[in-house]
């Protein structure tokens, strides 16, 4: 995930989430190891305000707790439709307890010079726009909309690069071969 990538490159990463929303333990361990090896840092807290303090970049993103994803996977394997409905209901109830975990203008004022870059992989739950109570206020999203859309525009290329890197033993050689071949992909 993104926290492992950022810690790998020596960034100071503060991960904040409400209690009960833990991530995959291996990801957390990897992020900690990368931070140690790169000279960065990895801090975990349960306060959005604490994580935003003096931050250069914020990347607030909602997720389901790892334990919920484990339960969901098991229910899917069993094809337990009723169990999935009950789990979804419990998740919505749990999420309702944390509606204050929204990236707002007030949070952004806590960042370095009150001007941190807001990032999001999209789509975002935008309060009063795409939902009643979301993960980011309309004001914050609007201020950073262009930057966020540019960021999202890179996703297809990053995904393609990851596929190439994992499917071919020597991706550079493969790309060079394709370029030399100069085969047109669309034939009319």
Q: Which role fits each region the language model picked out?
A:
Residues 1-74, 78:
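Glycine-rich phosphate/diphosphate-binding loop of Rossmann-like nucleotide-binding domains
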Residues 71-132:
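ADP-ribose/adenylate-binding Rossmann-like module
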Residues 5, 107, 139-140:
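Hydrophobic/aromatic ligand-binding patch that stacks against planar heteroaromatic rings
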Residues 45, 94-101, 148-152:
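Hydrophobic alpha-helical scaffolding
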Residues 1, 23-26, 46, 53, ...:
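Conserved active-site and cofactor/substrate-binding residues in soluble primary-metabolism enzymes
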Residues 111-188:
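Adenosine-phosphate binding glycine-rich loop
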Residues 14, 38-42, 69, 82-85, ...:
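Glycine-rich loops and low-complexity Gly/Arg-rich segments
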Residues 31-34, 107-108, 162:
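Broad structural signal for hydrophobic residues in well-ordered alpha-helices, predominantly aliphatic
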């Amino acid at each position: 995930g993104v926290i492992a990538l950022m810690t790998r490159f020596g960034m100071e990463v503060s991960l904040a989430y409400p209690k009960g929303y833990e991530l995959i333990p291996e990801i957390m361990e990897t992020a900690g190891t990368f931070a140690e090896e790169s000279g960065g840092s990895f801090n975990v807290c349960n306060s959005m305000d604490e994580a935003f303090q003096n931050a250069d970049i914020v990347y607030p993103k909602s997720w389901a707790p790892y334990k919920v994803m484990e339960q969901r996977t098991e229910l899917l394997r069993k094809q337990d439709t009723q169990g999935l409905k009950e789990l979804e209901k419990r998740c919505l109830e749990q999420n309702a307890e944390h509606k204050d975990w929204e990236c707002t203008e007030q949070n952004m004022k806590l960042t370095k010079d009150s001007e941190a870059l807001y990032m999001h992989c999209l789509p975002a739950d935008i309060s009063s726009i795409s939902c009643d109570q979301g993960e980011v206020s309309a004001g914050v999203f609007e201020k950073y909309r262009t930057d966020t859309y540019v960021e999202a525009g890179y996703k297809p290329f990053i995904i393609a690069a990851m596929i190439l890197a994992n499917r071919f033993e020597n991706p550079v050689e493969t790309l060079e071969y394709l370029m030399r071949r100069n085969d047109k992909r669309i034939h009319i």
